[in-house]
Swiss-Prot record:
Name the record gives this protein: Preterpestacin I synthase tpcA
Record region (Disordered): 361-380
Pfam families recorded: polyprenyl_synt, Terpene_syn_C_2
Chain span(s) of sequence motif NSE/DTE: 231-239
GO molecular-function term, one example from the UniProt record: metal ion binding
Pathway the protein acts in: Secondary metabolite biosynthesis; terpenoid biosynthesis
Sequence motif: DDXXD 1, positions: 96-100
Gene responsible for this protein: tpcA
Ranges where the record places region Prenyltransferase: 330-688
Binding-site list for isopentenyl diphosphate: K406, R409, H438, R455
Subunit-structure text: Hexamer.
Function field: Bifunctional terpene synthase; part of the gene cluster that mediates the biosynthesis of terpestacin. The bifunctional terpene synthase tpcA converts isopentenyl diphosphate (IPP) and dimethylallyl diphosphate (DMAPP) into the sesterterpene preterpestacin I. The C-terminal prenyltransferase (PT) domain of tpcA catalyzes formation of GFPP, whereas the N-terminal terpene cyclase (TC) domain catalyzes the cyclization of GFPP into preterpestacin I.
Length: 704
């Protein structure tokens, strides 16, 4: 029978007992404890540099005389992943400490800031210099490392950190549990256990199916109980003293539960918790053995998962018994040792508003009867001038702005501001202008393409009509220009107007090719992208540069050029992927659009030209004609032609090359500015084609 092997070092029981540790499970420590300590030191330094709130001076981090917390709870972690786990763990510790000293409302607000920062898809804007922006910058590099190491498990871990722990950790925190079952349920949420297990999976590079999770869940439940209660046992004195001194506003502990519900003294309550810990470890072993007996052929992977869960229980227990975080109260002199300086581990329908008044039919406009020799004013002549309601004008704009968004442009603005340092008031105006122009372009694009859907919702012109949509889009352009003229510099206005001309120029060729069924060359298509899609990215950059006081400014031209091309060609490719359910299956084919895969196919394989042009010729090209998509069979055939021509492989290869060029360009700018930009790297990572699903094989029929 294949046996489990270990990279970690076994801690002998005689050594562990010196700290007051009483776990019944074997303890192991990662052989690269130095990596965990280095990551913890980096976190403390990053927090001090970015947050500037001094909180790192009063927080005890993962360091301990017996080893770093992450080295003890993830002893079998892949070495390359240990550092990022330690970094996230210390983020959790300092966040937990801060929350204990806050009211529930303030703690929930701080949870919200960290939740947004840990969301790769978050598009909310934060003012430069705000705590929310500092938090986002602090965690961006860590998130990028997680995704780079293991995209699937990294995103799963970050989602659990954000959506499971932060979203619910302060829920019901004003309610006192009355039973151990209630308490463990609350502590599992508040104590971060729902994120710990995805972190353990990430540490091992181990994906576990839902069926496998269900099979081992009783064992994991026992492990969870052991983890939580060990923390309660060893942290009681610290938390009780912090509550008594006013440093903390509340205490959540099994010791407190037994004091409240059973009337026990503190010593007896702690002894009861100790018995519960030993019982939980015994249950863990019994449930594990029962599973192995009932499932003799259980995969070695699950045995390793269960074994590492047990090692996490014992490692956490050992660390809690020795770490300054839980034991500094024993020696007040250790309070001067913060996480940065403390000795590290031994391993080193809409109507207008009514008029301002209703004219009475028995009076004239001036309120007196007209004389016989004066001409009488007609009612129409007497109506006053007033400004009508803007509801009809604003409704299409509000509709499209409320749709889900990738938020790439807002994220890019925040990332570029790492280098340009535009003041927050002007940055808010820039974001508002870019969002207004982008939404206006979406309204016009859908109308000009006769597209019925936008992000899974009816396109604006379907709901409000063509004319009203055009009118609103035009108004949005006017409003954007007005905002720049009022709030930003003359150079920003010049940049806006010049790039708007480019946007219209690029769109003109996209429309020309569709209307005339003329397929452009690859070079012509890329040039169109540079003006249409790239123009928006170039616009936001040029406006930011006009508002920045940084001198000299780096050359961002190639960055925005590549970003526009990458963004559009990726969108062309993804239109054939499953995300198209939001806009319609292969909607680019319905629109008769010469996207990048089609351009490559027709330019390099003219034998397919007749098929595509014949299909495109059948589509309605007049905006007043209802959109009529190609049949599913037609789209399958054309997709198969693209597949056979190698268009999809070429598109992926093109995107891969551009992604590499973008990474090189970011490196160049970081070296030139002397400032790393994890937010920009994360923005690119969210759009990465690394590991992206390839479009499946579809065989075209040979019949005509």
């Amino acid at each position: 029978m294949e046996q489990l092997s270990y990279q970690s070092k076994l801690i002998c029981s005689d050594e562990s007992r010196h700290t007051g540790c009483f776990t019944t499970l074997p303890i192991r420590i990662h052989p690269r404890d130095d990596l965990a300590d280095a990551a913890s030191r980096r976190f403390v330094q990053d927090w001090a540099r970015e947050m500037r709130d001094g909180r790192e001076q009063s927080t005890h981090f993962s360091f301990s005389p017996v080893g770093n917390w992450s080295s003890l709870i993830y002893p079998e972690a892949i070495p390359e992943r240990l550092g990022v786990l330690a970094y996230l763990s210390d983020l959790g510790l300092i966040h937990d400490d801060g929350g204990e000293g806050l009211s529930i409302e303030d703690a929930q607000a701080e949870h919200g800031e960290l939740c947004a920062a840990l969301d790769p898809s978050d598009i909310s804007s934060a003012a430069p210099g705000s705590r929310a922006m500092k938090t986002k910058k602090l965690v961006s590099q860590c998130m990028l490392e997680c995704i780079s190491l293991d995209r699937e498990l990294g995103l799963k871990m970050l989602a659990a950190f954000r959506d499971v722990w932060l979203a619910i950790s302060e829920r019901n925190s004003d309610k006192e549990a009355q039973t151990m079952e209630e308490y463990l349920k609350y502590r599992s949420d508040n104590g971060g256990m729902l994120v710990f297990w995805p972190m353990l999976q990430f540490s091992l590079g181990m994906s576990i199916s839902e069926a496998e999770e269900a099979l081992v869940q009783p064992i994991i439940d026992a492990a969870t109980e052991g983890l939580l209660l060990a923390n309660d046992y060893f942290s009681w004195e610290r938390e009780y003293r912090e509550l008594q001194s006013g440093q903390s506003k509340r205490i959540v502990s099994a010791v407190d539960l037994f004091i409240r519900t059973k009337g026990l003294s503190i010593d007896d309550a702690k002894e009861e918790v100790k018995r519960k810990i030993i019982a939980a470890e015994r249950d863990f072993c019994q449930r594990r053995d029962d599973l192995y007996t009932n499932h003799p052929n259980i995969p070695l992977k699950l045995k390793r998962w269960i074994d590492c869960a047990g090692l996490a229980v014992s490692g956490n227990h050992y660390w809690c018994s020795a770490c300054p975080r839980q034991n500094a109260w024993k020696d007040m002199s250790s309070q001067s040792l913060n996480g940065a300086k403390r000795k590290t581990s031994h391993g080193a329908t809409i109507g207008m508003h009514e008029a301002p008044f209703k004219k009475r039919k028995d009076s004239s406009f001036f309120g007196s009867q007209p004389s016989d020799d004066e001409p009488s004013l007609s009612e129409v002549s007497s109506y006053p001038f007033y400004k009508p309601s803007g509801l009809a004008l604003e409704a299409p704009s509000k509709y499209v702005s409320d749709m889900p968004s990738k938020g790439v442009r807002s994220t890019l603005i925040e990332a570029l501001n790492t280098w340009l340092h535009v003041p927050s008031e002007r940055l808010d105006s820039i974001m508002s202008v870019i969002n207004t122009l982008h939404n206006a372009s979406l309204i016009l694009d859908d109308l000009e393409d006769n597209s019925p859907l936008r992000r899974g919702y009816p396109a604006t012109h379907i709901l409000f009509g063509h004319s009203q949509s055009i009118n609103t889009a035009n108004f949005m352009f006017v409003r954007a220009v007005q905002e720049v003229a009022q709030n930003l510099s003359p150079n920003a206005l010049v940049a806006l107007l010049e790039e708007l001309k480019g946007l219209y120029l690029g769109q003109s060729w996209d429309l020309y090719w569709k209307h005339n069924l003329a397929c452009p060359s690859e070079a012509e298509y890329v040039n169109m992208i540079d003006h249409k899609t790239g123009g928006m990215f170039r616009m936001l950059l040029r406006i930011m540069q006009a508002e920045s006081d940084v001198t000299p400014q780096p050359d961002f031209h190639r960055l925005t050029l590549l970003f526009g091309r990458f963004f559009q060609i990726r969108d062309d490719y993804m239109n054939f992927q499953d995300y198209t359910a939001q806009k319609g299956l292969c909607e680019d084919l319905d629109e008769g659009k010469f996207s990048y895969p089609v351009v490559y196919c027709l330019e390099n394989h003219p034998e397919y030209r007749g098929y595509f042009l014949s299909m495109f010729r059948q589509r309605p090209t007049i905006a007043t004609v209802n959109a009529c998509p190609l049949s599913g069979e037609s789209k399958q055939y054309l997709t198969a032609c693209l597949k056979k021509s190698g268009a999809f492989n070429k598109t992926i290869a093109c995107l891969t090359d551009m992604e590499r060029d973008l990474e090189f360009e970011i490196n160049r700018l970081e070296q030139q500015t002397g400032e790393t930009n994890p937010m920009l790297r994360l923005c690119l990572a969210k759009l990465s084609v690394k590991g992206i699903g390839r479009i499946g094989e579809v065989s075209p029929s040979t019949s005509k």
